[in-house]
UniProtKB/Swiss-Prot annotation:
Record-annotated PpiC domain positions: 139-245
Region (Disordered) location: 159-198
Signal peptide range: 1-20
Record lineage: Bacteria, Bacillati, Bacillota, Bacilli, Bacillales
Entry-linked Gene3D superfamilies: 3.10.50.40, Porin chaperone SurA, peptide-binding domain
GO biological process, one term: protein folding
Originating organism: Staphylococcus aureus (strain MRSA252)
Residues carrying lipid (N-palmitoyl cysteine): C21
SUPFAM superfamilies hit by this protein: FKBP-like, Triger factor/SurA peptide-binding domain-like
This protein's name: Foldase protein PrsA
Catalytically driven reaction(s): [protein]-peptidylproline (omega=180) = [protein]-peptidylproline (omega=0)
Domain of life of the organism encoding this protein: Bacteria
Amino acid sequence: MKMINKLIVPVTASALLLGACGASATDSKENTLISSKAGDVTVADTMKKIGKDQIANASFTEMLNKILADKYKNKVNDKKIDEQIEKMQKQYGGKDKFKKALQQQGLTADKYKENLRTAAYHKELLSDKIKISDSEIKEDSKKASHILIKVKSKKSDKEGLDDKEAKQKAEEIQKEVSKDPSKFGEIAKKESMDTGSAKKDGELGYVLKGQTDKDFEKALFKLKDGEVSDVVKSSFGYHIIKADKPTDFNSEKQSLKEKLVDQKVQKNPKLLTDAYKDLLKEYDVDFKDRDIKSVVEDKILNPEKLKQGGAQGGQSGMSQ
């Protein structure tokens, strides 16, 4: 999810918090972490240095992950997670290169796998709370291919054509495609300036409403399966769009559903915070530290704060 960000505070902060819960950090030597002739370093000192917000974030994340693991451990398949990792390894050019990429992010292979598992738990939670029907998925998604002729944003750009030339070229291609739509892929491979999709005969896969340029989306969702559009102008240039037949809908349905759930959470973070609150109630969560409780309630479980910050403490520590 876009709203997921890395946790920069070590999880050991949670251990410090637990040591401070239910007691004053100055009324017991048990709360002294380090002693010296110059004075002691207590849990309270360390918490003050790190900051309550970060400790609340870390401890809430740790608690939430424990709850999610308990609730959804039987629904998450480790074999599928291993398959995800193998896929990533191939994308990075092998195990060693993937391992180096993880190290650059401060991750180990085990930690990465743990993050994937936690992400899967969150998906299960949101799937429980946000219901999306097959008809809604079909209404909000469209399988598409396109041919793009880029327009230069400035004369010095190496890629693309000036607006007039780009439009003229797109119109010529559209006429060619209209004569024989079965050659769309062949023409896309040869003419499209979107090199990523051109390699795949112009295929974009499934496009969701709200995911792309508004003019592109408007034109695409007007098309019937198999139809080809007129020339469409977008912020990227000129397109010829084809609505592909969704023959693989059933196999792609779950992935599309997860993306739509993600969109809903982006638009309305209250869906996520309400799901978290339900979990806290279900598992009788009791915050022993009033300050930590205040931070969690005011910031982590506050949908308005999530909108402003674009990140949730409860789903931190995940990198995919």
